[in-house]
């Protein structure tokens, strides 16, 4: 679980633009996807499945583009700005449940996302690259170490990375160790967040209970203080950091998903608490 990341050989690619910058949400997407940095061999797909990929991607893109501009976001706990102020990128982690709202919130900032090479991963890759994300092909079960190595290189170049931490297929709300491994390798901080929406359609039969926001819904992005992992961390320390990340993910989900049921006094108290050290 806590193996070493492989090295990447080859020429270092030039940084094209800073990422996850709160000041420029409409920066142009990268000219070259991060997946171009290494050989990614796709699993065999039937002709019918290959035909479905662009159709599904187009439908999802249309939904996100239709819903996204109508959402009214409030942002709390923007701790990633502490790393950005030092000129360092961060490693973000969030639950798959809020992937639609997260895609819109972090769009066009060059964030590099771990992406699987299976059928679902192929249409997902088209969607997230359309919205200005980079992709590193891999998952917890296939090609993950190679994907982490690509993300490590991009972090060094100034690009933030992100994990749907219980993906690609669950179990729901159980964090995988990728961000902790990457943080030990690179020295970059882990930033966990969750997005809650006031009104949404929940896909109850989906493994992740994905939420599709209703048009014009209010939404809140809640982040937690940064988590740092020493490059000398042993297996026990890595387990502790993994548990710390799991607890932080649960905390921000609880706050974000209960937010619109709280009184204004309770929300104001939480605003002050979450923003006190940002």
For each of these PLM feature ranges, what is it?
Residues 16-68, 130, 145-278:
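Non-catalytic C-terminal accessory region of glycerolipid acyltransferases
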Residues 67-72, 90-91, 138-142, 168-169:
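Short, flexible loop segments at the rims of nucleotide/cofactor-binding pockets, characterized by
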